[in-house]
Curated annotation (Swiss-Prot):
Glycosylation positions in this chain: 186, 297, 392
The species this protein was found in: Rattus norvegicus (Rat)
Subcellular location, record wording: Cell membrane
Gene: Cd4
UniProt comment concerning the protein's domains: The Ig-like V-type domain mediates the interaction with MHCII.
Protein's UniProt keywords contain Repeat: yes
Source domain of life: Eukaryota
Name of the molecule in the record: T-cell surface glycoprotein CD4
Domain Ig-like C2-type: 128-206, 207-316, 317-374
């Protein structure tokens, strides 16, 4: 009886002691981390106070711990990247911090705390950008997600401020990148309802627009500016041009860019170009004419690829070949929706057609205007002064020159007449003076003779 009684009373005590020795294993917590980044593995105390703890690897090697007011650390060679947040211990939090994550860090870590075991599963993933995060306009970017073989294709989603959202599992590609796609992309990897976000900085190098068009009247200067975000890139450039009436394209100018300085290598003399020596690339034609109207391609060759920019030049010319005809002509690439309009200034359109050449017969004298418009937008306009009927430009020029010549002849005759009159006046004055002197001399001689005769008597 005594021995039975003793056993019945000792059994609860033995179970109580055994419960203190047993370590309770709980469910695993999953933590995601990106290669090269940091990860924080949680371990919380229910008492919310400082306590002894130990972090161990899956093979039971001690990484670090705290016991009897002493900090315990494992092999420095193996765990130099591992640490904890000591200022959180007083609050009952004992996290394991792993810096500069490696793919081989993916494993199960065990936190022993208050006679309990907390298992934390760390999944480290690697993101590969092909061909990189600095690309040329029009190129494609492929993002590949590598993770632990045990993980089956975790989904990834990337967002950009341009409202681009790309979703896929393990890998995705973005095609025909634009300059607007440059900037910070926020990507999120999801696994077992756990999410890890990281930023991707993407730089897309290229032109601000895929094509530019200049609308100019004949005789005006045309300027083409090519804003680029190339940084310190070096390149070779060429502008090839095909005039509207030319059978084929030709090289207009070749140049190079090195250390932010532009150097012209070869250029045509007709038209004559002016190229800026610094960025942004600026190309100027001092005087355009109908023969230059057309389109071309600016090609920039860089180490990482080739960039293209379409360039268009539309030229307008308004002429009055004779007194009975007014002509407006446009050459260069225009939209089928564009319309040519001829009208007198501040009046209704006389002619309005979707053609490149329009005419007005017997135009009234005054200021005439030719406009090239697309819808409500006027792309360009040019003005001309129309002379009265029967007085064309040649006649007007002849009249002006004749009048000028007549004026010069009249002025010359007036000057000659004035000089002659002056000469005559001077000659008359001189003759008058001579007569006066002669008169005075005769008077003196007569007086002398009379005095001499008187003396003889």
């Amino acid at each position: 009886m005594c021995r039975g009684f003793s056993f019945r009373h000792l059994l609860p005590l033995l179970l109580l002691q055994l419960s203190k020795l047993l370590v309770v294993t709980q469910g695993k917590t999953v933590v995601l981390g990106k290669e090269g980044g940091s990860a924080e593995l949680p371990c919380e105390s229910t008492s919310r106070r400082s306590a002894s703890f130990a972090w161990k690897s899956s093979d039971q090697k001690t990484i670090l711990g705290y016991k009897n007011k002493l900090l315990i650390k494992g092999s420095l060679e193996l765990y130099s990247r591992f640490d904890s947040r000591k200022n959180a211990w007083e609050r009952g939090s004992f996290p394991l911090i792993i810096n500069k994550l490696r793919m081989e860090d993916s494993q199960t870590y065990v936190c022993e705390l208050e006679n309990k075991k907390e298992e934390v599963e760390l999944w480290v993933f690697r993101v590969t950008f092909n061909p990189g995060t600095r690309l040329l306009q029009g190129q494609s970017l492929t993002l590949i997600l590598d993770s632990n073989p045990k993980v089956s294709d975790p989904p990834i989603e990337c967002k950009h401020k341009s409202s681009n959202i790309v979703k896929d599992s393990k890998a995705f590609s973005t095609h025909s990148l634009r300059i607007q796609d440059s900037g910070i992309w926020n990507c999120t990897v999801t696994l077992n309802q756990k999410k890890h976000s990281f930023d991707m900085k993407l730089s897309v190098l290229g032109f601000a627009s895929t094509s530019i068009t200049a609308y100019k009247s004949e005789g005006e200067s045309a300027e083409f500016s090519f804003p680029l975000n190339l940084g310190e890139e070096s390149l070779q450039g060429e502008l090839r041009w095909k005039a509207e009436k030319a059978p084929s394209s030709q090289s207009w100018i070749t140049f190079s860019l090195k250390n932010q300085k532009v150097s012209v290598q070869k250029s045509t003399s007709n038209p004559k170009f002016q190229l800026s020596e610094t960025l942004p690339l600026t190309l100027q034609i001092p005087q355009v004419s109908l023969q230059f109207a057309g389109s071309g391609n600016l090609t920039l060759t860089l180490d990482r690829g080739i960039l293209y920019q379409e360039v268009n030049l539309v030229v307008m010319k308004v002429t009055q070949p004779d007194s009975n005809t007014l002509t407006c002509e446009v050459m260069g690439p225009t939209s089928p929706k564009m319309r040519l309009i001829l009208k007198q200034e501040n009046q209704e359109a006389r002619v309005s057609r979707q053609e490149k050449v329009i005419q007005v017969q017997a135009p009234e004298a005054g200021v005439w205007q030719c406009l090239l418009s697309e819808g409500e937008e006027v792309k360009m306009d040019s003005k001309i002064q129309v002379l009265s009927k029967g007085l064309n430009q040649t006649m007007f020029l002849a009249v002006v020159l004749g009048s000028a010549f007549s004026f010069l002849v009249f002025t010359g005759l007036c000057i000659l007449f004035c000089v002659r009159c002056r000469h005559q006046q001077r000659q008359a004055a001189r003759m008058s003076q001579i007569k006066r002197l002669l008169s005075e001399k005769k008077t003196c001689q007569c007086s002398h003779r009379m005095q001499k005769s008187h003396n003889l008597i």
